[in-house]
Amino acid sequence: MENEAFVDGELESLLGMFNFDQCSSNESSFCNAPNETDVFSSDDFFPFGTILQSNYAAVLDGSNHQTNRNVDSRQDLLKPRKKQKLSSESNLVTEPKTAWRDGQSLSSYNSSDDEKALGLVSNTSKSLKRKAKANRGIASDPQSLYARKRRERINDRLKTLQSLVPNGTKVDISTMLEDAVHYVKFLQLQIKLLSSEDLWMYAPLAHNGLNMGLHHNLLSRLI
């Protein structure tokens, strides 16, 4: 019995050693075997690169198509805006022609105002030219020069007469001339009274009665 147990133990130990050697040989063979990673690439197990390479062109085509669509859409959006701008500019150009104000077009209204203003300017310029010509004609006419000098002399005489006639500067020209006539008659009466031997004493009375009309009576007596 003891021999059989010993034999069995030896067999088990031999089997264990055999298994160990086989495992070690398998490990050495596994270690000495060429590396499968060197033979098989990662792309064989996970072909993401090929997928990306195959789809890259499609992605680029899609992106280009999308960008073209975006550009086309932007151009389509810009075209109506350009049309709107052109239409607004055309409206601005045509509005002054078609605008109305108080039942009358602004163009005709403005044109009529301009014509009126031009007419007024032309009329004023013509009137000024006529006045200038008239003034030049009057200044160059010898008769007008003589008449002007005569008026100046008359004005000087009137001023002198106003200073001689009593209260002549306090009244107008016509009243002053009437007073001047009466004053001259009174002076004539005074001269006659003073030159008469019989009536010289009436001279002060004639002077004081100038405003009462006594000088008329004295003149009638002298005549």
Swiss-Prot record:
GO MF annotation list: DNA binding; DNA-binding transcription factor activity; protein dimerization activity
A single Gene Ontology CC term: nucleus
Stretch list, region Disordered: 64-113
Coiled-coil annotated spans: none
Disulphide-bonded residues: none
The keyword Nucleus is annotated on this UniProt entry: yes
Pfam entry (one): HLH
Intracellular or extracellular location(s): Nucleus
Record-annotated bHLH domain positions: 138-187
SUPFAM superfamilies listed in its UniProt record: HLH, helix-loop-helix DNA-binding domain
Keyword flag Transcription: yes
Keywords on record: DNA-binding, Nucleus, Transcription, Transcription regulation
PANTHER family: TRANSCRIPTION FACTOR HEC3-RELATED, TRANSCRIPTION FACTOR RSL2-LIKE
Subunit structure of this chain's protein: Homodimer.
Name recorded for this polypeptide: Transcription factor bHLH139
Source organism of the structure: Arabidopsis thaliana
Gene (UniProt): BHLH139
